[in-house]
C-alpha cells in the first residue's frame, strides 16, 4: 500500500520533511541560542607562573577561551560569546563601573575575535595587556556580575542558555570586606533567579584554592549536579580544557515525559541525547550580491486557476487500487496517533537477556525532572538502585511525541562515575535502548565455515596477545571530518594553509611488525600453501575442452514445453534467469529487463 501523500504534492513534501526530520537517523535539533560570557580575573596574580616552563593562569584562560571560540565557529556559529576582564586599571562597560573591561560584547564567534584574543597570549600578550588594559585591584564582584547581566539583557535574540564562566586563582577576592562579599552573594542569587548560571573555573595558586571560603555560595549548581562535588583546581591547560568542555557542552533535554510505573504512580523524566554521529554541517545558500544567507519559501498554487492555496485548501490522499481516497489533515494525524507521549512500564527482565545483536540505533538517556513533579528524583533514584541491585532492566513502551509510532525500549541502569578530577565521566540514570521488532532481524548469509586446527588457533592467540591495547573511542577521530573542520578554521582565520590531520584510524604498520616479529610469517606457513602470494594475480581456470567455444547455458525447458507456454500465454511466469538462458540458447539479442527478454522470445517463436 502506498503512503499517505498530499493531494498537492509540493505541500505534502514540505510538511513531510517538517514532520519526519526529528526522527531521522537520531538527529535532534533545539531552539534558541546558547550564550556564554568568559569572565577572566586580570589581577597581577593571574600573570605569575608557578615554574619557568609553566603557563601563567591568564595564558591558560586565554588559550582555553580561544579553543572554545574556534570550536564554536565550526559547530555552533549562531551561539553568542563574550569576554570580560575584571581587576583592570582601565574600564570599558555600559554602566561605567571601575576596574571592569568588556573586551568583546555578546555576539557570534568569528575570525576577528579569535585573532583579537591571540594578541594576549605569551610574553608579547602580557606586555600588550599591560599597555592596553593594565592591572588593578579595587573591584567589586557584584558590579562585575551586574555588567554581565546587562550584556545578556542587551541581546534581543531568544536565548536557550545563559552562562558565565569565571576564571580566577583567588579564592577570597574581597578578603575582610564583608560588605562587598555580601553584595556579591546577593547579586549571584539574583542571577540564579533569572536563569543565569555561574560556573567557576578555578586555577592553581600557592597554598591551594579553597572553594568553601567564598565561591561555594556564589557558583550555580545545576539540579542534576551534586552540591558536595566540586572540580579540583587546574594546574595544566589540559585539565582546564576538560573542565570547560564538561561545563560548556549543551545539556539540552529532547523532551520531558511522564514515566508511568502503574495506574497511580507517575514521575517526570527528561530524555537526553548523549551520543550522536558527527556529520559535516549542511551547506548554507548565500545571496550572490550581498553574501547573506537566503531562506527558501514554498507556496502551493492551483494548477488550473493559478491562485494561491492555503493549508486549509489542501487534502491528503491515498490511491487504493484505482480509487483515490481523500482525507483531511486532522484525519491522517488521528491515524498516526497511537498513544499519548510518555514512558509506560511493561515489566522487568534480567540484564543478561539484552544481547549485543539487539542494537538498532544509539541509545538515549533518561534522568528525573524534579522541577515539574515533586518527588520524581527520589522515586527515580530508588528504581535505579533496585535495578542495579537485582541486575534487571525495565521494559517500557516509549512514545516520544504525538503522531509518532511507539517503540519498545529497555531501560538499562547506569551508575555515576567520577574521575580523579571529580569530573563526571558517566552520569547516573537509565540508558534507553531501542528494542528490535521481529522484522528488524535478518538472516545473514555466511560463507562456508573452514575449521582451523589447534596449532593455527594457538598461533593466532599469540598474535592477538601481542597486539592488545586499551581501546578508547575518543582516541580515534574521523579524519575526513577533522580535515574539513581544519579547512574551515583556516578560511575563517585567514591562514595560508590548513593544518594536516594525522589519520589515527590507519594501522601502525611498523609498530605491528616490531611487536609481532616472526609470528606473522609462522602463521602464514601454517595457513597458506607453500609459495602462496596474496598479491599475485589469480590464474584463470582452464576450460574442460580448450578447443571448444564457450559453454551453452543450461536450459531446463524442452522445446515442447516452451511452445506450450507460448500457446497458453504463460511465458511471463518464467523467471528472468530462465528467460536469459533460453534467449542465449537460441542466439537471441535482447536487453536485461524481463519485458525485453519476453519480446525477443515471442518474436522468435512467432517466426518459427
From Swiss-Prot:
Entry GO MF terms: 5'-deoxyribose-5-phosphate lyase activity; ATP binding; damaged DNA binding; DNA helicase activity; double-stranded DNA binding; hydrolase activity; telomeric DNA binding
PTM statement from Swiss-Prot or TrEMBL: Phosphorylation by PRKDC may enhance helicase activity. Phosphorylation of Ser-49 does not affect DNA repair.
Subcellular location: Nucleus; Chromosome; Cytoplasm
Interaction with XRCC5: annotated segments: 371-480
N-acetylserine modification, residue list: 2
InterPro entries: Ku70, Ku70/Ku80_beta-barrel_dom, Ku70_bridge/pillars_dom_sf, KU70_core_dom, Ku_C, Ku_N, SAP_dom, SAP_dom_sf
Region (Interaction with BAX): 576-581
CDD domains, per the entry: KU70 (cd00788), vWA_ku (cd01458)
Annotated Ku domain residues: 259-466
Catalytic residues in the record: 29 (schiff-base intermediate with dna)
Coiled coil start-end: none
PROSITE patterns registered for this protein in UniProt: SAP
Region (Disordered): 1-29, 534-557
Cross-link (Glycyl lysine isopeptide (Lys-Gly) (interchain with G-Cter in SUMO2)): 315, 554
Enzyme Commission identifier(s): 3.6.4.-, 4.2.99.-
Residue positions where N6,N6,N6-trimethyllysine is found in the record: 568
Compositionally biased spans, kind Acidic residues: 12-22
Compositionally biased residues, Basic and acidic residues: 1-11, 537-557
Annotated knockout phenotype: Viable. Reduced number of peripheral lymphocytes, however number of erythrocytes, platelets and neutrophils are normal. Translation levels in erythrocyte precursors are normal.
Sites of N6-acetyllysine modification: 29, 329, 336, 459
GO terms classed as biological process: cellular response to gamma radiation; DNA damage response; double-strand break repair; double-strand break repair via nonhomologous end joining; innate immune response; negative regulation of DNA-templated transcription; neurogenesis; positive regulation of lymphocyte differentiation
Subunit description: Heterodimer composed of XRCC5/Ku80 and XRCC6/Ku70. Component of the core long-range non-homologous end joining (NHEJ) complex (also named DNA-PK complex) composed of PRKDC, LIG4, XRCC4, XRCC6/Ku70, XRCC5/Ku86 and NHEJ1/XLF. Additional component of the NHEJ complex includes PAXX. Following autophosphorylation, PRKDC dissociates from DNA, leading to formation of the short-range NHEJ complex, composed of LIG4, XRCC4, XRCC6/Ku70, XRCC5/Ku86 and NHEJ1/XLF. The XRCC5-XRCC6 dimer also associates with NAA15, and this complex binds to the osteocalcin promoter and activates osteocalcin expression.
Family the entry assigns: Belongs to the ku70 family.
Entry function: Single-stranded DNA-dependent ATP-dependent helicase that plays a key role in DNA non-homologous end joining (NHEJ) by recruiting DNA-PK to DNA. Required for double-strand break repair and V(D)J recombination. Also has a role in chromosome translocation. Has a role in chromosome translocation. The DNA helicase II complex binds preferentially to fork-like ends of double-stranded DNA in a cell cycle-dependent manner. It works in the 3'-5' direction.
Protein name per UniProt: X-ray repair cross-complementing protein 6
Annotated organism of origin: Mus musculus (Mouse)
Source species taxonomy: Eukaryota, Metazoa, Chordata, Craniata, Vertebrata
